[in-house]
UniProtKB/Swiss-Prot annotation:
It catalyses: GTP + H2O = 7,8-dihydroneopterin 3'-triphosphate + formate + H(+). This is GTP cyclohydrolase 1. Keywords: GTP-binding, Hydrolase, Metal-binding, Nucleotide-binding, One-carbon metabolism, Zinc. Toroid-shaped homodecamer, composed of two pentamers of five dimers. One of its GO terms (cellular component) is cytoplasm. Its EC number is 3.5.4.16. Belongs to the GTP cyclohydrolase I family. The gene is folE. Disulfide bonds: none annotated.
Length: 206
C-alpha cells in the first residue's frame, strides 16, 4: 500500500510546530535574493506574501483526509453490477523532485460490490493526492489503494495521463511529452477483457 494513511491530515507535521506564515515569506525573500532579484523593489514587495498564499492553496491536500471524504458510502446498489467510470478528471500537482507543475487527467473505474460513493467524491480523492508533492506513479497507486480500502469493490482501474513541466521547462525540454500510469486491482487486474474495455472507454472521444 502506498501511504494512503497519508490521506489523514498532515501526518508529518503531527505533533510538530508548523512554520509561521511570516517565516515562509522570509524564506521566499531569501529565494528571490538567491536568484539575483531585489525583493525590495516595487514589483516584488508583495511577492513573498502572494507566493506563500498560493502555496497554501496549491498544497492544500496535506490538510485533507481521505477518511472524511470516503468515510460515508451508500451500501445499496440496487442490483447494479456494471463498472462506474469517471473520466477526464482534470488535476494539477507538483513533482517532488523539482517542485515544478504536473498537469493532467485521471480516469477511474470501480466495479461495486456492496458499496458506492457519490461521483464528486471520486474527483475529490484525486485532489487530495494531487495537491501535494508527488510522483505520478505514487499518486496513481494512492488513489487506487484509497478506493480499495474504503469501497472494497470487486475491481478498480486508475489511469493517469499527465505532462510534467520538469520535462518541458528544464532538463530534456521535450514539449508535449505525456506520461501514462495505471493501477489495476481485483477483477481489473485479473481480467484482460475488463482492462481493455476500460482503456477503450477512456480513449473514446467525449
Amino acid at each position: 500500500m502506498h501511504n494512503i494513511k497519508g490521506g489523514t491530515k498532515n501526518p508529518f507535521l503531527s505533533g510538530r510546530k508548523r512554520p509561521h506564515f511570516e517565516e515562509v515569506e522570509a524564506a521566499i525573500r531569501t529565494l528571490l535574493l538567491w536568484i539575483g532579484e531585489n525583493p525590495n523593489r516595487e514589483g516584488l514587495l508583495d511577492t513573498p506574501r502572494r507566493v506563500a498564499k498560493a502555496y497554501r492553496d496549491l498544497f492544500i491536500g496535506y490538510g485533507e483526509s481521505v477518511e472524511e471524504i470516503l468515510g460515508t458510502v451508500f451500501e445499496e446498489v440496487s442490483g447494479y453490477n456494471e463498472p462506474v467510470i469517471v473520466k477526464d478528471i482534470s488535476f494539477y500537482s507538483h513533482c517532488e523532485h523539482h517542485m515544478i507543475p504536473i498537469v493532467g487527467k485521471a480516469h477511474i473505474a470501480y466495479l461495486p460490490d456492496e458499496k458506492v460513493v457519490g461521483l464528486s467524491k471520486i474527483a475529490r480523492i484525486v485532489d487530495v493526492f494531487s495537491r501535494r508533492l508527488q510522483t505520478q506513479e505514487t499518486m496513481t497507486a494512492q488513489i487506487a489503494d484509497a478506493l480499495e480500502e474504503y469501497l472494497k469493490p470487486c475491481g478498480i482501474a486508475v489511469l493517469i495521463e499527465a505532462e510534467h513541466m520538469c520535462m518541458t521547462m528544464r532538463g530534456v525540454q521535450k514539449q508535449g511529452a505525456t506520461t501514462i500510469t495505471t493501477s489495476f486491482h481485483g477483477s481489473y487486474e485479473k481480467d484482460q477483457v475488463a482492462q481493455t474495455n476500460f482503456m477503450m472507454i477512456v480513449r473514446r472521444s467525449s
